Swiss-Prot record:
Pfam families linked to this entry: SRP9-21
Transport as UniProt keyword: no
Full protein name: Signal recognition particle 9 kDa protein
Domain of life of the organism encoding this protein: Eukaryota
Family (UniProt): Belongs to the SRP9 family.
Subunit structure: Heterodimer with SRP14; binds RNA as heterodimer. Component of a signal recognition particle complex that consists of a 7SL RNA molecule of 300 nucleotides and six protein subunits: srpa-72, srpa-68, SRP54, F37F2.2/SRP19, F25G6.8/SRP14 and ZK512.4/SRP9.
Origin species: Caenorhabditis elegans
Molecular function as annotated in GO: 7S RNA binding
Keywords from the named record: Cytoplasm, Ribonucleoprotein, RNA-binding, Signal recognition particle
GO cellular component, one term: signal recognition particle, endoplasmic reticulum targeting
GO biological process, one term: SRP-dependent cotranslational protein targeting to membrane
Purpose of the protein: Component of the signal recognition particle (SRP) complex, a ribonucleoprotein complex that mediates the cotranslational targeting of secretory and membrane proteins to the endoplasmic reticulum (ER). SRP9 together with SRP14 and the Alu portion of the SRP RNA, constitutes the elongation arrest domain of SRP. The complex of SRP9 and SRP14 is required for SRP RNA binding.
Keyword flag RNA-binding: yes
Amino acid sequence: MTYFTSWDEFAKAAERLHSANPEKCRFVTKYNHTKGQLVLKLTDDVVCLQYSTNQLQDVKKLEKLSSTLLRGIVTQ
């Protein structure tokens, strides 16, 4: 598992992993209510990328990343 501390690094790695094999990739979001923390995980069962945040601005970036990944699926 690779844990990222920077959103930009996570987003670039997620796009690379997804473009390599979009059929096997899974994108999971988990929110911990007590800690106020959002955990994002993208995996293809070989490589696992994780990013954790408690910032609202990162949620908006998540929306942009998920739309980019979905756009990649639709265009194939």
